[in-house]
């Protein structure tokens, strides 16, 4: 039986195939691709995601309309039950096509536009997709967490941050090689987690409870190393 990681990536691959030529023009973001960043042998499984987040280089209504017309030719249609104009559906799969910069319809994640230039290719289920560097992925998640303002113990964005810190072997090195702006943001994130009055709890509640104390200390060490960059 496929696990969460395999199921998430299988759905991402199905979306990539449906996009066809447009697949070369987008970057996959969000929790559906998080297992790509899990380089730790024996990494825990990520959570299942309800939708696929795809970043697109559009910023005007006319560009969004042109994208809508292109997607319709690929049997990808606006979700009639969607809560925002960026949500589409394809054979029961929910897909959010997120603009890479702010539009007249509202803000977007400020790390998507710089992330587009730094995206790299990887292959899943036999098809190539573009994803963000792990440092920028963390920056998008930190901004998303702050914009929603939820308790870190119950936040999917914060859960994803902890998952990457726990399961990516090269995260500190990647942050060290990132831009000064990314480093500044991730240092703020690190300070928040380490200085939180319930620091251990907000980390350990998102990781395997059998090894929570050991892995939690390992994550805190990574955060300290990020602060020293």
Q: Where are the regions a protein language model picked out?
A:
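Compositionally biased terminal segments of proteins
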Residues: 1-229
């Amino acid at each position: 039986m496929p696990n969460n990681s395999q199921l998430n990536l299988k759905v991402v691959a199905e979306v990539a195939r449906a996009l066809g030529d447009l697949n070369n023009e987008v970057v996959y973001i969000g929790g559906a691709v998080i297992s790509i960043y899990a380089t730790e042998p024996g990494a825990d499984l990520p959570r299942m995601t309800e939708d696929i987040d795809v970043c697109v280089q559009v910023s005007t209504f006319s560009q969004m309309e042109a994208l809508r017309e292109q997607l319709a030719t690929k049997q990808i249609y606006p979700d009639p039950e969607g809560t925002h104009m960026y949500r589409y559906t394809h054979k029961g799969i929910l897909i959010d096509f997120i603009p890479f910069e702010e539009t007249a319809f509202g803000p977007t994640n400020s790390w998507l536009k710089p992330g587009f230039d730094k995206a790299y290719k990887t292959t899943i289920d036999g098809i190539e997709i573009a994803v963000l560097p792990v440092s920028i992925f963390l920056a998008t998640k930190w901004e998303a967490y702050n914009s929603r303002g939820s308790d870190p113990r119950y936040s999917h964005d914060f859960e994803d941050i902890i998952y990457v810190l726990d399961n990516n072997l090269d995260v500190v090195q990647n942050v060290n090689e990132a831009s000064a702006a990314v480093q500044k943001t991730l240092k703020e994130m690190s300070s928040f987690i380490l200085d939180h009055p319930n620091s251990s709890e907000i980390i350990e509640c998102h990781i395997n409870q059998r090894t929570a104390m050991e892995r939690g200390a390992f994550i805190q060490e990574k955060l300290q190393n990020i602060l020293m960059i």
